[in-house]
């Protein structure tokens, strides 16, 4: 449906929007982002089940409610400290969402409780005469509001059923979550990451998850480097039977989230498989919100391998903490 959007930092514009919609001040707006990796700047946790929803329905008509790290602006944050985020698929919304220095807060272009507009002509006159700009993109392709899902409880709950129906959400969430670690040759860093993640996650067997690794320039069926095997053995992990695996379209398609070690890996995957751009993260980007790389220890000393393993383990612990949404929560619509 057609929407209204403002820069959430512009208090005058925000107040004008609320007045035009006759919208209660305690009802926040929805944050639009042009890509999912930007959510790290706004949320405390990205629960495991939300990864499946994000990979399946973003960009698209799904709004996800997260616990936020923000205290303000009031127009985006609920009294309970939650925020609604969506990555839209429409090119106009995508372009505006990607503008620098704008926090794009949105809502439907209607008076509160009234039907939403499917064309520019259906936008109420009292809204049309007050807004600064109307972008007429013709009739909306879907004509229905986004589905809203709260993932802040142990089991996600549907707050509003829209384009994406509850049965489809339920079916999606029944599938296991697939995590893929990627480096260059799949003989060092991604091997370490896969093994370390599995070890740390081992006590959470009630949640269906599959972890794999691959390399952007890997050859098939090569063993890890001797130093990789040694430093993993020092951690009680045996990776000697691991065989290197090239990155393939099938691996990318089945993954719900892809962690890369370097920006070149991220760009490589995005360029060859553009459909996957919303599920590719630098490992440190997801864990800590930093666009920093984990360098390749190949050709360096055994101690460099130990340093790399420690670095990866530190980030993996943060990842597990971030996706482990296990907490007390009431039975929900998807429960």
Describe the residue ranges of each PLM region.
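Active-site-adjacent structural elements in enzyme catalytic cores
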Residues: 1-182, 333
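Conserved beta-strand segments of alpha/beta enzyme cores
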Residues: 103, 133, 210-212, 238, ...
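Short helix-capping segments at alpha-helix termini
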Residues: 24, 201-208, 273-276
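Conserved active-site segments centered on acidic
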Residues: 176-254, 321-325
């Amino acid at each position: 449906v057609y929407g209204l959007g403002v820069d959430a930092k512009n208090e005058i514009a925000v107040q004008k929007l609320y007045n035009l919609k006759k919208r209660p001040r305690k009802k926040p707006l929805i944050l639009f982002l042009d890509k999912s990796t930007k959510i790290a700047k706004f949320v405390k946790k990205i629960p495991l089940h939300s990864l499946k929803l994000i990979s399946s329905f973003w960009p698209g008509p799904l709004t996800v409610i997260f616990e936020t790290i923000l205290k303000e602006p009031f127009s985006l944050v609920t009294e309970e400290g939650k925020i609604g985020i969506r990555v839209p698929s429409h090119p106009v919304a995508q372009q505006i969402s990607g503008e620098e220095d704008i926090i794009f807060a949105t809502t439907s272009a209607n008076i509160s409780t009234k039907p939403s507009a499917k064309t520019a002509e259906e936008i109420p006159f009292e809204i049309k005469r007050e807004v600064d700009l109307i972008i007429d993109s013709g009739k909306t392709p879907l004509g229905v509001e986004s589905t809203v899902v709260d993932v802040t409880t142990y089991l996600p709950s549907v707050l509003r059923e829209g384009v994406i129906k509850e049965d489809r959400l339920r079916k999606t969430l029944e599938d296991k979550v697939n995590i893929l670690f990627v480096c260059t040759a799949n003989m060092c860093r991604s091997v370490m990451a896969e093994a370390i993640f599995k070890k740390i996650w081992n006590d959470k067997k009630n949640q269906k998850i599959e972890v794999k690794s691959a390399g952007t320039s890997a050859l098939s069926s090569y063993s890890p480097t001797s130093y990789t095997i040694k430093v993993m053995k020092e951690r009680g992990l045996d990776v000697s039977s691991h065989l290197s695996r090239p990155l393939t379209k099938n691996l990318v398609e089945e993954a719900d989230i892809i962690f890369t070690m370097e920006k070149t890996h991220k760009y490589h995957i995005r360029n060859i498989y553009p459909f996957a751009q919303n599920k590719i993260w630098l490992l440190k980007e997801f864990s800590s919100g930093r666009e920093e790389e984990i360098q390749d220890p190949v050709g360096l000393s055994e101690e460099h391998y130990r340093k790399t393993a420690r670095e990866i383990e530190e980030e993996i612990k943060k990842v597990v903490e971030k996706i482990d949404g296990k907490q007390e929560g009431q039975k929900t619509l998807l429960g």
